[in-house]
Regions:
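Conserved beta-strand-loop-alpha-helix junction that forms the acyl-donor binding cleft
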Residues: 88, 114-124, 141-145
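Acetyl-CoA-dependent GNAT
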Residues: 5-79, 84-85, 97-99, 103, ...
Length: 154
């Protein structure tokens, strides 16, 4: 699997499509996260030097994405970890997560946070725990019942 930082207009459009697929798969209205504004402004907060918007390419096909953004002086947030269905179950999600964690360390962040949901994201929660993420109190308001907040010390 290869990773590219989405930067060209074509790459940004591909990332936007993946984000839209992610939102449809999630089956939750992400308006509380200003998702429409996020899509319109890509790469936005995910742009270097403080952020990343990575897309995964597997067998010359766009497989998935992951992003990170700065949310505090030494803290970043992992966002939008997503794989298209035909690429799941092959360890690619772990590779995406490990790559974005390595990017966060390279930037100089000391901790990475994320929020996730039980149910549809149970496999992701298992992955996050395996990578060393620990549950923490909510660090922002997420109105979705059962939202889980996690942090990894980098």
């Amino acid at each position: 699997m290869n990773f590219i930082q989405a930067s060209s207009p074509e790459e940004i459009e591909s990332a936007r499509e993946l984000f839209e697929e992610y939102a449809a798969w999630l089956q939750i209205d992400l308006c509380f996260q200003s998702f429409d504004k996020e899509l319109a402004g890509l790469p936005g907060q995910y742009a270097p030097p403080d952020g990343r918007l990575l897309m995964a390419i597997e067998d010359d096909q766009l497989a998935g994405c992951v992003a990170l953004r700065k949310i505090g002086e030494d803290t970043c947030e992992m966002k939008r970890l997503f794989l298209r269905s035909q690429f799941r179950g092959k360890g690619l999600g772990r590779k995406l997560a490990e790559t974005i964690i390595a990017e966060a360390r390279q930037i100089g962040y000391e901790r990475m946070r994320l929020d996730t949901l039980p149910g549809r994201m149970d496999q992701a929660i298992k992955l996050y725990r395996a990578l060393g993420f620990q549950e923490i109190p909510a660090y922002y308001h997420n109105p979705v019942e059962g939202a889980t907040f996690m942090e990894l010390l980098l």
